[in-house]
Amino acid sequence: METRKLSSCALAVRVALVLGGALSLPALAADPAPQPAAKATASKDTSDIERIEVTGIRASMKASVNTKRFSNSVVDAITSEDIGKFPDKNVAESLSRITGVSVTRDFGEGEKIAVRGTDPSQNRTLLNGSAVASADWFVLDNPSRAFNFTLLPSNLISSLEVYKSPQADIQEGSLGGTVYLKTFKPMQLDANTLKLSAEEQYSDNSEKWDPQLSGLYSWKNDDETFGFLISLTRQDRTLVREGKESLGFVRQTVDGKDYWAPRVIGDANFEQKRERKTGFAAIQWRPAERWDLNLNILNTKLDANNTNHNLYTFLNDNFNPADAVISGDHIVAGSADNATSQLYVIDRISYSKSKAYDFEGSYDADVFKVTMKAGFTEAEGGTSRDRHYQFSRVMDHVTFDGLNHTDYVDASNTESRDQLLARPFDWMQEGARTMKDEERYGGFDFELPVSHGIFTDIKAGVYYRDHDKSQRQTGTRFHWYKDDQLNGAWGDVLPGQTNWASGVLGQYSLSDFVGGDSTANYPLLDTGKAAAIAYPDAAFASPTATFLFLADTWKVNEKIYSAYTKGNFQGEGFRGDVGVRFVKTEVRSSGYLWDGDATAAAISLLDGYSLLADAVDPSAGGDWNVRQETAKHSYDDILPNLNLVFDLTDDTLLRFSAARVMSRPDYVDIAYHESLNIPTRSGQRGNPNLDPTRANQYDIAYEWYFSDTGMLSGTFFYKDIEGLVKYQNVDAQAYDEQAGENVLVNVTQPINGAGSEVKGVELSYQQEFGNFGILANYTYTDANAKEERDPVTSPGSGLTLGTSKHMANLTGYYENDWLSARLAYNYRTHYYDGISEYGSEVFTDNYGQLDGRIGIKVMENLELTAEAVNITDEDIEQYHIDKSAPSKKYSNGRRFYVGLNYSF
């Protein structure tokens, strides 16, 4: 795609059109040691650090430094001014600037985070101390425990902290660290605080402008006994991701030796329109002097409709050994005969939405304090409509070199663009996938000041969580249309694939679906025109047109009971806390498994879904023969922890922490589901009897605070992890409809493996030099799985997911009375990223991103801003085992923002 540069004229016009605005919400008072439901104590007098006015970068740095310094735990923090000054439109981007925290940016925007060499699903995110349900919009994302940060705009957050060593009063479930987000409270802000922001975003890949709007209003009465806050945000983005990809590697024999060879190579054009709307409301009421009642309501939705055009070449097993170019253990270039080429288009209506209702009430009687917490959160995401279109042809001879390949319209294959347009329609299918996440929770905390020995207060509490995670997948049957070149197997209609109302689809060609111009060497579909032809309303009048994919429909319920006790202590030159958390988890997993009995009776369905009897009876033309199953499992955990801080001097301290932590397995792994591919005799299924991954962890840290905003720190961390989830192959019996008999299928299922050992070092430095300043950090992580490496028979063995050995951040800034500027660079080295579509390993290569922001104060309450994301236009690149075998390369492009911010 030709890169079009943003002209200064266009930029000036956009700035002139932007109206209203407010920056990162308010100058506010912040607690210098914001530990959830805990009082941080220090052995030195801290009475002079009660409240900090966050009015600029330096004040923000001071607040973050104090949070870290006076916490008993190993904590890193960012305040509201940090988030507002960075070019961060969601919280994940802000978190990526903390030591030990990495972020995924599959579509050019931070989505999920990981801490200290762990998987994103092994780290919890809490909003005001409670979970927020989340779901993914992307069809290839499995329901997991990882929080989707694309739902949460950063202007909602007053501060964030990453707890790398646990406290007994913080919810369990994090193996790497717990992200603790705090929103603004009405009593924090001045009465009638108003913040407005209006921006325009330009994406250079899509060459589109999109609006970014937000506003916040906060009020409280003169007595400060009642207040409310309302925040509204809308952020649009037109996304184009251009890519080349290999969907996996398989073993091929050349001259009697096996090598890894690409299975499918393709070009991908992904287009998406994102529209995120978020509403947040907070009510704070103090009905009496000792009471404090808070209600927070969050409602956020992301519409993420997208279309993906793929031009694939299936090399199949027809490699020409004489043409193979070998590099190490890979065939990196060569040719194949009788390959298949496809123009494959997917058009999706995708979304993700979350709601959270959180209530907290406290009564402080001086001699004791009681806090009650209760709430409900729910989320839903996925694709409400997922339409597939395919046009195929057989190619006599193709060549490939890395991710370059002979494509559908290559002239050497004697098919011109006009001939391509005359190709008949191959097949189509429509589906929908809905993922739901719900949690109901409640608990009590009791805090008692004491003066027994070194202890200053004792805290205890109980907590209950009832969590549901489910997935439902529906679809039409596959509909194939005869093409003599496709050798029968693809042209024949199988049982259960008849009676589609639009049975004349075979008369259409690609030219009937094409609309508009394309800069690519192949035409793009007009999806509206294609839908009118392939999916007329009459097609769905047939009662058998749509059915439930039982193998991908399941539900998991967890009931979690926890209790804890914790003591804060302080002595001459030391302080800390010690505690223990007791947790019981009860799991109930329901789903559907294949049944070897071809005459099995009809089944009942989860959550009241209905299903026609012929859908489960092969003799009636049904596709499956299944049975519903429910499994129960439970486990208990005792999680002690110790945080100890020694004040070496007035400016230096030494930390030590030790703890037992746990992380529950991903929902898709414990779901009772089974997905089988009978022709290939392969499949996958879940394992409801998985136990959590557990670890013993230790931290030692040295910290030097040489000024109010200056700090130098070093931390060594170690985790001995046990029970990491791995995958094994087992034989299972299934019914083959075409053969009319039971067959053995090789099924991959998760089990608890040996574990891993993670150790590393975090270094952090920040200092100001007059109006200039610098923030820098570096993380080294060495993660080793406790099993042998075998990428051929056990892909992923001996590897730890998502772990980069080296990560670094460097930020420079300048600030005076009217100008504020920052330039921030984030870097991480390669890491193991999971298993490909064909079961081979995928690694993501080194990646660095440069972002910047400038703010100019044009009036007392008005600021003009300009921001840039991914300034150097970096691509995301992946490979298989070694870099000689590229797997994927994606360009998300750069983004630019111009805007006005107004505060009153």
Located regions from the model:
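Gram-negative outer-membrane beta-barrel transporters
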Residues: 717-721, 725, 730-836, 872
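Outer-membrane beta-barrel signature, preferentially recognizing the C-terminal barrel domain
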Residues: 346-348, 352-354, 552, 556-559, ...
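C-terminal beta-signal and adjacent terminal beta-strands/loops
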Residues: 827-834, 855-904
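Outer-membrane beta-barrel translocator/receptor signature
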Residues: 139-146, 155-162, 169-252, 260-263, ...
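Extracytoplasmic beta-strand/coil segments of soluble accessory domains associated
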Residues: 92-134, 164
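Outer-membrane beta-barrel transmembrane strands
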Residues: 183, 198-201, 209-220, 267-308, ...
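N-terminal periplasmic "start-of-domain" segments of outer-membrane beta-barrel proteins
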Residues: 53-86, 112, 123, 135-137, ...
